[in-house]
Structure formats: structure tokens, C-alpha cells
Amino acid sequence: TGSSVLPEADETIHSGTGRYAYIKMRPMSLYESGESNGKVSLADLFVGKPFETQTNDLTIDDITYLTCRGGWPWATLISKEVALDQAFDYVDSVVNKDIQRVDGVKRSPERAKLLLRSYARNISQQVPLSTIRKDMLANDSSTLDEDTVTDYIKALKKLFVIEDLEAWNPNLRSKAAIRTTDTRHFVDPSIGTASLGLGPKDLINDLKSFGFFFEDMVVRDLRVYAEALDGKLYHYRDSTGLEC
């Protein structure tokens, strides 16, 4: 996450087809960082093995902390106070350096911040690009069209900061209309909380917002587990309200 290829490196001498394999490195899941006991296996669920509901010893304080800390490897090894700063430092680096270095295009750090904040306010929700643009315009007095917003989003996706969740469309004969708008997500929930300047106590004081960030963390972990099985994660929602 955040370790993108520099512009000049895009001009590869050899494509590497047949020689190299690309591996997507993600932030650590709760199982990888040792906070999840891993008693329920996704692989077992897919083959229909029976399972029992499991519990762990994590409290609401623990979960809000883990949401704000994120799955950054170094953050899992240091004190809680210092660990929470990692996401803030990461966001600062993205908006002030990486957003321009990723493809050599000059972009405004302030607009990058506005976009991250707007994404964080709409995290785990199916909102169109127009909604994000309006949210940014409320804090940007200059002209801001959808093409500009799209450009910033593409740059942040290339930096592995933003990773929306695609809608699953089974194309079945159903009277229910399938919602096809992507769900807005970060690669790690701590990017969203840091973008809004939130900490664990802020999430506890606003449990509704915490629910959206918690969903973002669940999506992060499920992506890790699904990809280990050569799978891909999608969301589903239809006009009847059925959602998964």
C-alpha cells in the first residue's frame, strides 16, 4: 500500500510474461497481526464443513483501536500511542508527496486531503462520484469538475490507497433490480480515520460512524482471506434491500 511504481519505471524493457508473477501486498489482517483467533475458516465454509459460532476476548475499545491502528506491520510491533501515529504519517506522505510522484502529474495536496476526507465520510457506502464531488465542493471554492475528481481517485487507486468494492451482478432472471454502484473503501480503515483526524475514543462516541469503518476493516480482511483461495470479493444489493 502506497508503494507504487515511479513514472520512469513504467517503461519496462521486458514485460516479464512467463517469467514473473505479480503479488499484491496488503496491510495485515487481524489474523496475521495476532488479534483474531482464526477459529472460523473461510476455506471450510466454501466446502460446506459444519462450524460453530466462535467468540474472542476483544472489547469495543480493542476493536476501535485496531480500526484506527490499521494493519501496518510496524504498527503491530510498537506501543499503542506511537502505533496510532503511523496512519497519520502515512496520509500526510500520500497527499504531500506520493500523489504527485505516482505519475509525475502536479496535484494539489489540499484537494487530495479533501478527497480522502470525503471518501472517509462516505466509507462503506454506495455513493456516486457526483456525491463525492459535491462534498468536496463544500470545502473547495475553486472550480472542481468530475474529471478532476476522477483523476485524483485514479492516482489514489494506483497508490493502493483507495480500493472500491465492485458490485456482483449474477445476471439471474429476477424481478429485483441489482445495484451496480461500487462501494467506497480504503485499502485499510486507518486511512479513513486518520483522514478525518479520528481516534478510538471518537469512534466509541459515534458508533454509527464506527460501524462503517468496522465494515471497511472487515472488507480488508475478507479480501486477504479470499485472495489466499484465489477468490475475489464483491458486494451485492438489490431493490428489495437484500444485501451482502
Which positions does each model-derived feature cover?
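Interdomain motor-coupling "hinge/lid" segment immediately C-terminal to the ATP-binding subdomain
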Residues: 3, 9-125
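Short beta->alpha connector loops
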Residues: 3-6, 239-241
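Accessory nucleic acid-recognition modules appended to NTPase machines
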Residues: 76, 80-243
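Hydrophobic alpha-helical segments and their boundary regions
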Residues: 7, 59-60, 177, 204
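Conserved RecA-like P-loop NTPase ATPase core
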Residues: 1, 33, 67-70, 156, ...
